[in-house]
From Swiss-Prot:
GO terms, molecular function: lipid-linked peptidoglycan transporter activity
NCBIfam families xref list: murJ_mviN (TIGR01695)
Superkingdom of origin organism: Bacteria
The protein's annotated pathway: Cell wall biogenesis; peptidoglycan biosynthesis
Keywords: Cell inner membrane, Cell membrane, Cell shape, Cell wall biogenesis/degradation, Membrane, Peptidoglycan synthesis, Transmembrane, Transmembrane helix, Transport
Localization terms from the record: Cell inner membrane
Species annotation: Burkholderia cenocepacia (strain ATCC BAA-245 / DSM 16553 / LMG 16656 / NCTC 13227 / J2315 / CF5610)
Gene that specifies this protein: murJ
Keyword Kinase appears in the UniProt entry: no
Lineage: Bacteria, Pseudomonadati, Pseudomonadota, Betaproteobacteria, Burkholderiales
Keyword Cell membrane among UniProt keywords: yes
Protein's name in the database: Lipid II flippase MurJ
């Protein structure tokens, strides 16, 4: 498998997902701005998203994919299919029960996540109602995650990468065609989540059928629980869930703090999140997606050299592409925010608030993306306890940082704390891989960094000049001109960065690597 071609495939569909995601956020921003309605929706949407990351997308993927790869490479098709059927049965039934409990206790859940909304007589009940509507989303997205894990293990990356686009399409359709006809327009967004969750699973069925891995959900989850592969996955999910829950606990605490910083703070951070997740998904998630199955196979084959080489390739690609992305978030935060969101009720003040959060995200972006590359180095070896221990320490540091940064820079202090924590997390993961002899750096890193820093310094200067010499919020009345200027700047940035690297003798051929 050509790793770079696989990366381009996943990144291409992820780019489509993020573009449609930005379109959805732009429509929501234009319709609702940063108001009690958006605060209520984003708090409500964060709840099933947190549970999704805990039970499905995060802990489940980390535990399931390495074991699935082991079954595929060592036990054959029939045993692998039996594992998929049993796992889908357990997952569907467990999360269906959790959904019922969540719907019944929605008011308590919202209070726990964003107690600051409780004093708002309108936002709190809105958040509770939308939480009840969206809770079943975790059932559909868990099946989607299982399907994605299966397809990725079979080196089929296109459909899993495309699936999130359908959630954004559902949002856009709801905002444009449904919301204007509802008494409470924001409820349309909640129903879009459910529709999008169903579509994300259905679109992957053709790919599953092609490899004869369509999951069959049984009526007896207790019998499925006795499958030895399921037992192993669940045993790995315990520390994996704890690892992911530590990160999500940090998000919950930050949401709670943001809800106490005044109206709009939750939304400011959410809009910054959308922009920060753009490079994170295009690079970090895409690389993690293609590396985990290949790392798992190298582990099963006991090929330590290939294992280390895969990590080395992933780290170099990360630094190559994450560095300019981080500079863009830091130096170009206001232009990016204004171009994408400065329409309708999204005024200049909101642009400033979002840009502050986005710029501080830029400080920690490389660390955030590196985690997506380094953590699979442990997961593929079915070692989840080490990332757990690191995550606990990082949670403490992150929250202590909030006490320092939030009083100084308000809501931007929350995003800065996340970045600081991510950098510490990635450093400790790297040291752990080196200490265990899992990763041995290939020759040429010093030259690579010298070239990278040289190109980055020149790029930073150009970005800063473009940011301060154009009135990005003042171009609100000429949106097409502003979009054209943004496109021209981004093309210029890319040409300068990669051109400078080429002038300094950078070897791009290294990145055309094949996995065994």
């Amino acid at each position: 498998m050509n790793l770079f071609r696989a990366l381009l495939t996943v990144s291409g569909f992820t780019l489509l997902s993020r573009v449609t995601g930005l379109a959805r956020e732009t429509l929501i921003a234009r319709a609702f701005g940063a108001s009690q309605y958006t605060d209520a929706f984003y708090v409500a949407f964060r709840i099933p998203n947190l549970l999704r990351r805990l039970s499905a997308e995060g802990a489940f993927s980390q535990a399931f994919v390495p074991i699935l790869a082991e079954f595929k490479n060592q036990q054959g098709h029939d045993a692998t299919k039996a594992l998929v059927d049993a796992m889908s049965t357990v997952l569907a039934w467990a999360l269906a029960v959790l959904s019922v409990v969540g719907i019944a206790g929605a008011s308590w859940v919202v209070f726990a996540v964003a107690s600051g909304l409780h004093s708002d007589g309108q936002a709190f009940p809105l958040a509770v109602t939308m939480t009840r509507i969206m809770f079943p989303y975790i059932v559909f997205i868990s099946l989607t995650t299982l399907a994605s894990g299966v397809l990725n293990t079979y080196k089929s990356f296109s459909l899993p990468a495309f699936a999130p686009v359908l959630l954004n399409v559902a949002f856009i359709a709801a905002a444009v065609f449904v919301a204007p006809h509802l008494k409470v327009p924001v409820y349309a967004l909640a129903w879009a989540v459910i529709v999008g969750g169903v579509l994300q699973f259905l679109v992957q069925l053709p790919g599953l059928k092609k490899v004869d891995m369509v999951p069959l959900i049984g009526l007896n989850p207790l019998r499925a629980l006795r499958h030895p592969g399921v037992k192993r996955v669940l045993a790995k999910m315990v520390p994996a869930t704890f690892a992911v829950s530590v990160a999500q606990l940090s998000l919950i605490i930050n949401t709670n703090i943001a809800s106490r910083l005044g109206q709009g703070a939750v939304s400011w951070i959410n809009y910054a999140d959308r922009l920060m997740e753009f490079p994170t998904a295009l690079l970090g998630v895409a690389l993690g997606t293609i590396l985990l199955p290949s790392l798992s196979k190298a582990h099963v084959d006991a090929d330590s050299h290939e294992y280390s080489a895969l990590l080395d390739w992933g780290l170099r690609v990360t630094f190559l592409l994450a560095a300019p992305s981080a500079l863009a978030l830091f130096f170009f935060a206001t232009p990016l925010t204004a171009t994408l969101f400065n329409y309708g009720k999204f005024d200049a003040h909101t642009v400033t608030m979002v840009a502050r959060a986005l710029a501080t995200y830029g400080i920690g972006l490389v660390g955030i993306i590196l985690i997506k590359i380094l953590a699979p180095g442990f997961y593929a070896k079915q070692d989840i306890k080490t990332p757990v221990k690191i995550a606990i320490g990082v949670l403490i540091v992150t929250q202590l940082s909030n006490y320092v940064f939030v009083p100084l820079i308000g809501h931007a202090g929350l995003t800065l704390s996340i970045g600081v924590g991510a950098c510490l997390n990635s450093l400790l993961l790297f040291l752990g891989l080196r200490k265990r002899g899992i990763y041995q750096p290939s020759p040429g890193w010093l030259r690579f960094f010298v070239q990278l820093v040289g190109a980055a310094l020149v790029l930073a200067g150009l970005m800063h000049w473009c940011a301060i010499n154009f009135d990005w919020t003042g171009m609100r009345a000429q949106p097409l001109d502003r979009i054209a200027l943004m496109a021209a700047c981004l093309v210029l940035f890319a040409a300068l960065y990669f051109g400078m690297l080429w002038v300094m003798g950078f070897k791009y051929a290294y990145f055309r690597r094949r996995a065994k």
